[in-house]
């Protein structure tokens, strides 16, 4: 490990610890109430079900779990996203390690992930994106394990995690779209998922097993959540607006870190089209493009493509630090 790298890791973890400490202190000393969506999720948690009007049920379940053990308080609610992002950072570490087999880089990636503007800001807010990012990351990890070690149990666990992702937010459908993209791009993925059809059936079976209660609930209430999601998308009001598209792209660079993104752009020509690159781009670019199109046609909030940040950020950090002789701390 180089002297610069040691200094970077030390500095990063000092700032990481200070950031966590500041967030915990802010939670304890603030007198703010829960904002609209947080309050709504808390109300749902008082009456558990397999679905709700505008969201799948996981957010209510997890609030109920934490408040049962820690009590119904502002502090408890605000602790949840912080805890989940810390665990997500560890999953990102495992993902980077699985992809590049470099512990130093994996540590840097995980620490940088937690300090990424999107994560730093949203760790103060209890949103469904917090849980989707966590289970999306776990799904990516077991997708990798399923390809490198195609045991039946890995496909079963993959289906479970993707299913839970759907229970956090229906945007998890992007995972299935991205899977199809990677199957098209990568021969080994095609072999594992298509030519060995038992693996695909196990994956689909465990996915549906997790989703079944929510599907039944939606059927019983006239698919109200899907109707709400469709209305929220507003594609029936489509009108091309390129400015909104540029606005969305700008918001994504802010969420990633403008400085790291600019460095990445300068290093982009050195990217090799390896399996790692195909994997990470397959689970990021399709999501960005879909939401970008929606932003041009109707509108799109910056967080609608949040899951794409996981794969793209890992690739970006790999390229920045691999191509730079000197470690750059942002």
PLM features: what roles do these ranges have?
Residues 57-61, 71-90, 122-125:
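Loop-to-helix entry region of an early transmembrane alpha helix in multi-pass inner-membrane enzymes
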Residues 164, 175-277, 283, 287-295:
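Transmembrane-lumen/periplasm boundary regions of multi-pass, lipid-linked membrane glycan transferases
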Residues 79-100, 138-142:
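Transmembrane-helix motifs of polytopic, lipid-linked glycan transferases
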């Amino acid at each position: 490990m180089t002297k610069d790298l040691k200094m970077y890791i030390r500095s990063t973890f000092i700032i990481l610890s200070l950031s966590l400490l500041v967030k915990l202190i802010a939670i304890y000393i603030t007198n703010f109430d829960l904002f609209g969506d947080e309050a709504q999720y808390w109300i749902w948690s008082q009456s558990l079900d397999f679905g709700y009007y505008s969201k799948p049920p996981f957010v209510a379940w997890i609030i109920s779990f934490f408040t049962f053990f820690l009590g119904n308080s502002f502090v408890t609610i605000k602790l949840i996203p912080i805890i989940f992002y810390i665990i997500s950072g560890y999953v990102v570490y495992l993902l980077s390690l699985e992809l590049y087999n470099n512990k130093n880089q994996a540590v840097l990636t995980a620490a940088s992930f937690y300090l990424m503007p999107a994560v730093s800001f949203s760790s103060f807010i209890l949103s469904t994106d917090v849980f989707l990012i966590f289970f999306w990351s776990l799904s990516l990890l077991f997708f990798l394990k399923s390809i490198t070690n195609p045991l039946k149990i890995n496909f079963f666990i993959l289906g479970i995690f993707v299913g839970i992702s759907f229970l956090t937010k229906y945007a998890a459908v992007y995972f299935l779209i991205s899977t199809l993209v990677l199957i098209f791009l990568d021969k080994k993925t095609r072999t594992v998922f298509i030519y060995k059809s038992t693996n695909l059936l196990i994956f689909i079976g465990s996915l549906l097993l997790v989703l079944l209660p929510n599907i039944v609930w939606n059927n019983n209430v006239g698919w109200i959540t899907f109707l709400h999601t469709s209305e929220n998308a507003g594609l029936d009001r489509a009108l091309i607006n390129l400015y909104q598209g540029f606005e969305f792209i700008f918001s994504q660079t802010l969420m990633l870190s403008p400085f790291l993104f600019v460095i990445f752009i300068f290093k982009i020509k050195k990217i090799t089209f390896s399996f790692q690159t195909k994997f990470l781009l397959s689970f990021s670019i399709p999501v960005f493009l879909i939401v970008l199109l929606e932003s041009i046609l109707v509108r799109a909030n910056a967080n609608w493509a949040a899951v794409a940040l996981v794969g793209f950020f890992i690739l970006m950090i790999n390229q920045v630090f691999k191509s730079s002789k000197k470690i750059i701390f942002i």
